[in-house]
């Protein structure tokens, strides 16, 4: 027997700015349940030039953002967008620490799209690793990113498979992109038991003692010297704190936590 039910809130998720992720295929979306609260989740919310027109076109009442970015958030507010922070939430059954009976398999790992405009620091990381691969005995692991053409992402490790590689790596290089925002890697890596090396997003100073900082404008020599210090064990305390941080994230940034927070956010307007 089919149960008849009526929603009390509409939540629509957009991944990014490409057309395949921004077209709502629900017929008469703006005419259905017009009296219900409408929430919009836009994961790549740094693409405000796409998010703002979508928000207004489909008459959303609130934009749920995955991260804080002071300058960007002010722009949204000045454009009449009502924002709230939901956050990123990671599958802790897949991204987790695993026992390494033989120790770390890799000394340092790099993964993600290599692009000079979008990820200038990651490009420098890649160039430094090429140099170190020739000049040192470090066990370097690079997971090439095939690009974003159709079917390409199926060729690279994801979820549990990716977490296992991270877990096998003592250090993992991360960057906040040219937008200097918090990305999922800043959670995936510590949750999988590796210590991050990279820049700290300006709106997240609390990461300072939980990762090894390399500023976004660092030159190649600075990157090399910082990596050298890592293997001279100058950051042992940071490694310990990173592990504690990863365990904390597995309890506070898992899917159940995300579900509970989303309920809390939506209940505020439903019960208003």
Language model feature labels by segment:
Residues 209-217:
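A short acidic/histidine/glycine-rich donor-binding loop in glycosyltransferase catalytic cores
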Residues 1-7, 12-29, 35-210, 257, ...:
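Nucleotide-sugar donor-binding catalytic core of glycosyltransferases
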Residues 184, 217-218, 253:
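Residue-level signal for the nucleotide or nucleotide-sugar donor/cofactor binding architecture
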Residues 232-270:
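A charged, aromatic-enriched C-terminal amphipathic alpha-helix characteristic of glycosyltransferases
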Residues 218-236:
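C-terminal "capping" alpha-helix adjacent to the active site of nucleotide-linked donor transferases
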